Amino acid sequence: MKAAEIREKFLKFFESKGHTIVRSSSLVPGNDPTLLFTNSGMVQFKDVFLGAESRPYSRATTAQRSVRAGGKHNDLENVGYTARHHTFFEMLGNFSFGDYFKRDAIHYAWELLTGVYQLPKDKLWVTVYHEDDEAHDIWAKEVGVPVERIIRIGDNKGARYASDNFWQMADTGPCGPCSEIFYDHGPDVWGGPPGSPEEDGDRYIEIWNLVFMQFNRDAQGNMTPLPKQCVDTGMGLERIAAVLQHVHSNYEIDLFQALIKAAARETGVSDLTNNSLKVIADHIRACSFLIVDGVIPGNEGRGYVLRRIVRRAIRHGYKLGKKGSFFHRMVADLVAQMGAAYPELKEAEQRVTDVLRQEEERFFETIEHGMSILEGALAELEAGSSKTLDGELAFKLHDTYGFPLDLTADVCREREVTVDEAAFDEAMTRQREQARAAGKFKMAQGLEYSGEKTTFHGYDEVVFDDAKVIALYVEGASVQQASQGQQAVVVLDHTPFYAESGGQVGDQGVLANASVRFAVSDTLKVQADVVGHHGTLEQGTLKVGDVVKAEIDAVRRARTARNHSATHLMHKALREVLGTHVQQKGSLVDADKTRFDFAHNAPLTDEQIRRVEEIVNAEVLANAPGIVRVMSFDEAVKGGAMALFGEKYGDEVRVLDLGFSRELCGGTHVHRTGDIGLFKIVMEGGVAAGIRRVEAITGDNAVRFVQDLDARINAAAAVLKAQPSELTQRIVQVQDQVKSLEKELSALKSKMASSQGDELAGQAIEVGGVHVLAATLEGADVKTLRETVDKLKDKLKSAAIVLASVEGGKVSLIAGVTADASRKVKAGELVNFVAQQVGGKGGGRPDMAQAGGTEPANLPAALAGVKGWVESQL
């Protein structure tokens, strides 16, 4: 039974039992930004289990795409070397949300395994939590599993309820016992039943875990029954396929064999048992589906995990002798295997291929040099007694050659060498500190402060009349007063000034009273809720305890707000035009523009840019109100607000609804979309592999931009004596005229050169039977020089010729030698003889060579020496 059929039978079986088939969710969890990747079937139902979300069904079944690589769940180093470790796998599951419980879950599992899949009953063993008599009795008395094949597993992890057979979502919350089903491969395979000293062997393989969410655990460890008991089960498709296909390794199932053969084809390897082929076959699945779900190779977060997996696959291909791109060509093979089950893979095939090809090309630029350095270091270790690679070297490989630490460790492991990870971490920390010191980091980040928090009023006010100075810093040190002319940081108890955050720059403005004026040039956070006002004391003496009027530059704030609100609309529009894989990777919003970096693997076309502008400006014209609500993070995400992985969110978040956009945002914004005014994209380009950047302007800036553009178009039209509407046509006409004139000019130059060539032939001097000619051809370009040399060679029969021209202070040289003379006189050596004297160099074939120089004053003497040089060669 093939993997595709196993998947289909699972889903159809539970559909027949009243379950709704639910599509696999994204590998990027939409409801939990703290989770790196979706790693089980229950992730998309987490809020349902917690009671925070309701679904129109109480029974569900899924085939969930899952990844375990990076973070807590990291199987990367074992992938390819064991029978059952993968970065990507499919989890088949059935779920009950307050509907059926243990009895039905157990009976369903048994019916599917023994009835639909027709596994021998005597090959199946089960485990239960040692206190779960209910599950034990259902297995023994109702299903009929012999008690000797039902194993009670106790608290084998050192504490009450700390057991392989007791599941917990977290330290508190829903939890309960679980029952695992094992398949016995028979006595020919080493290993013992679960709970025995030999349980790590391969004879008894877990194929299905049935989790019974029965209790709620509080902070004190007390267990109380849940009002709605739930079921969460998970069976790895690859594991059950290995059992049903009578093989002992997941890599031997049909799905993997097809990918292993594809890897062998691309790397030219014939041994299909090679572990590197298994690595590549596994990694093409993880990489492709991560890209499908919007992850792009990068240097942080999910993007860096993806980059590590891609580069590990490339390294194993390199190990097999593949010195060029190959990995991306396997996407088509994966689509053939899994495209029917996951149409989103088929739809994204070209995008996935392009992203992988770009990442391969990027790494192949450095892998050979990096591997050479690593191999040299390993050879030195083998010659000595140490078995530890220097962490500083591992960091150099990471920093200079793009080798992730686990890739270096992977290579070392094959030689039984470890990496000094502590030294690697020290080098990484040192580099970060140097980067911070070298970067433009403002004083606020290093200030020591332990006072009260700043209350922010800037969402509603641009002025706060009675703000009290609660701290002062000069040159990074806490002081009680600042004097006129000093630069300082002022901390207030209340402020309307927005501190730089979320890509939005800090406010500028003034702090003042009757005797003091402090010009604020920037606003930064000293701590999460403490605002530092950076600037210069222009008048008076400012003391801790003084009361000042805090007033922001309202015009600058309004422009910044327009740009920030436009960023939200543009983000949404980009996702509509390019696809939901578009994710924000960085932004900068100030009074002049918005700069937005996002995940996308190709330049935007003119039509795509125009479409984004149309969508945003349509939202502006709709003049929709901006609605701000404060709510819990879970409620915000449930309501569709976009949350960014890696951002830190508190228990309560600020949600901005603006037109068709809904995002979590703490920045300042317009009251209505119409306040944005005109929106115009002025730049689009790439900033890194898979990352594009768009810059846009709004309001009066956009109007001025369009007016300036209009003025330039009108001026250009006037120069070309055309109407603006006819400008393109007129430019094409001028280009055609220029091409025609260039063609005529080239013909005239050729004719002139031919004429000069006839005259120059008479200047040749015979030396040892070879006609030697060295001369300057006025006004000739390189093409004309070459044509003239060819004609002179034909005319003179046996010759060594150097022709030169001077244009803009630069010398062009062409040397030509006829075939009979080139055995002794080489054109490359001849042209270099002249070039070295005019400050240049060159080279070429024995019969024709080219050079240049920058010292035309030396040209006459250099050409005069050609005759003597040729004589010396004959």
Swiss-Prot record:
Record bears the keyword RNA-binding = yes
Matches recorded under InterPro entries? aa-tRNA-synth_II/BPL/LPL, Ala-tRNA-lgiase_IIc, Ala-tRNA-ligase_IIc_anticod-bd, Ala-tRNA-synth_IIc_core, Ala-tRNA-synth_IIc_N, Ala-tRNA_ligase, Ala_tRNA_ligase_euk/bac, DHHA1_dom
For this protein, the record's SUPFAM superfamilies field holds:
Class II aaRS and biotin synthetases (SSF55681), Putative anticodon-binding domain of alanyl-tRNA synthetase (AlaRS) (SSF101353), ThrRS/AlaRS common domain (SSF55186), Translation proteins (SSF50447)
List the GO biological process terms: alanyl-tRNA aminoacylation; negative regulation of DNA-templated transcription
Identify the CDD domains for this entry. Answer: AlaRS_core (cd00673)
Point out the coiled-coil segments of this chain: none
Task: Give the main location.
Answer: cytoplasm
Keywords from UniProt, A to Z, are: Aminoacyl-tRNA synthetase, ATP-binding, Cytoplasm, Ligase, Metal-binding, Nucleotide-binding, Protein biosynthesis, RNA-binding, tRNA-binding, Zinc
Give the binding site residues for Zn(2+): 564, 568, 665, 669
Any GO CC annotation of this UniProt entry: cytosol
Which EC number applies?
A: 6.1.1.7
What does the note under cofactor report?
Binds 1 zinc ion per subunit.
Q: Which reaction equation describes what this protein catalyses? A: tRNA(Ala) + L-alanine + ATP = L-alanyl-tRNA(Ala) + AMP + diphosphate
- Where's it found, cell-wise? Cytoplasm
The Swiss-Prot or TrEMBL note on domains reads: Consists of three domains; the N-terminal catalytic domain, the editing domain and the C-terminal C-Ala domain. The editing domain removes incorrectly charged amino acids, while the C-Ala domain, along with tRNA(Ala), serves as a bridge to cooperatively bring together the editing and aminoacylation centers thus stimulating deacylation of misacylated tRNAs.
Tell me, what does this protein do in biology? Catalyzes the attachment of alanine to tRNA(Ala) in a two-step reaction: alanine is first activated by ATP to form Ala-AMP and then transferred to the acceptor end of tRNA(Ala). Also edits incorrectly charged Ser-tRNA(Ala) and Gly-tRNA(Ala) via its editing domain.
The UniProt similarity line reads: Belongs to the class-II aminoacyl-tRNA synthetase family.
Name of this protein: Alanine--tRNA ligase
Q: Which species?
A: Paraburkholderia xenovorans (strain LB400)
